[in-house]
Amino acid sequence: MFNDIPVFDYEDIQLIPNKCIISSRSQADTSVKLGNYTFKLPVIPANMQTIIDEEVAETLACEGYFYIMHRFNEEARRPFIKRMHDKGLIASISVGVKDYEYDFVTSLKEDAPEFITIDIAHGHSNSVIEMIQHIKQELPETFVIAGNVGTPEAVRELENAGADATKVGIGPGKVCITKVKTGFGTGGWQLAALRWCSKAARKPIIADGGIRTHGDIAKSIRFGASMVMIGSLFAGHLESPGKLVEVDGQQFKEYYGSASEYQKGEHKNVEGKKILLPVKGRLEDTLTEMQQDLQSSISYAGGKELDSLRHVDYVIVKNSIWNGDSI
């Protein structure tokens, strides 16, 4: 039963080094394959309005990174797919599960996107299973990511319905308050939930939420993730769509959750909040730093590629890796 498994989160885990076999971290390969495509890093900027827009998506695709466009400007999705395909780039969009989304999916037959993410807060539901089956029937070549979920049963059920990958994480994100508003979720034990779910998975798992440092990417891969979706570390850049705000002479960018009243436009079923983040500089600099840090992780793992991270030992240190310091 679940109560017998170890419960921990990112800050509770330290990975144990192996002998380094490369002469420079630049020799470490951080690329990852998802479906028929290979991407430069196993990270995905969260498909949120304050993280990604069409310009950011195009930049990421041009540079060889995976992206998922958010679903909150519904009318723009078909023109976006055409724009990306006209430029020879992959199209990766999000859909919900409302009735009109079925007709939308069917309308994409002539210009199908390479990736569709079914994006709802509680993905272990009949509505998601039915949408997976519909997409697979109408667009059989499209890679379907479904979520979000937090249990092995959910992973198995979505995979059996036809999902090509599942997204694991219920409310661990920095601007998500699901655990506070509902009492449910993987907030505070996201890494243990990832480990639990990945043991049941036969297809790729995307860890979504709770990433606070670049080292958490390596930890996610160690515990079963193929890719890692990240919000707060990608928010607040000069290119980020979030509104620019000046406070006491310092510039900030807005960052809010996908179930917040700021995104929904109403105070109903709110499970997200808004925060201000100091402007961080350019997105490409963060991506470069992430890659370099992940290359260092691979070198500590004693390998040359991401898979080496899956085989390292670890210790559970219960919140002590910061030695009393806060991040």
From Swiss-Prot:
Q: List the disulfide bonds.
A: none
- Which superkingdom? Bacteria
| CDD domains reported in the protein's UniProt record | IMPDH
- Keywords of the record: NADP, Oxidoreductase
User: Which GO biological process entries does UniProt record here?
Assistant: purine nucleotide metabolic process
Enzyme class, first EC level, given as a word: oxidoreductase
> Could you tell me one molecular function GO term of this UniProt entry?
GMP reductase activity
Q: Which Gene3D superfamilies match?
A: Aldolase class I
The EC number(s) given in the record are 1.7.1.7
**Which parts of the sequence bind NADP(+)?**
205-228
GO CC terms of this entry: cytosol; GMP reductase complex
**Active-site residues from the entry:** C176 (thioimidate intermediate)
Q: Which SMART domains match?
A: IMPDH
Q: Which reaction does it catalyse?
A: IMP + NH4(+) + NADP(+) = GMP + NADPH + 2 H(+)
What HAMAP family does this protein's entry cite?
GMP_reduct_type2 (MF_01511)
> What is the role of this chain?
Catalyzes the irreversible NADPH-dependent deamination of GMP to IMP. It functions in the conversion of nucleobase, nucleoside and nucleotide derivatives of G to A nucleotides, and in maintaining the intracellular balance of A and G nucleotides.
What family name appears in the similarity comment? Belongs to the IMPDH/GMPR family. GuaC type 2 subfamily.
Q: Which NCBIfam families match?
A: GMP_reduct_2, PRK05458.1
Tell me what this protein is called. GMP reductase
> What organism is this sequence from?
Streptococcus agalactiae serotype Ia (strain ATCC 27591 / A909 / CDC SS700)
Taxonomic lineage is:
Bacteria, Bacillati, Bacillota, Bacilli, Lactobacillales
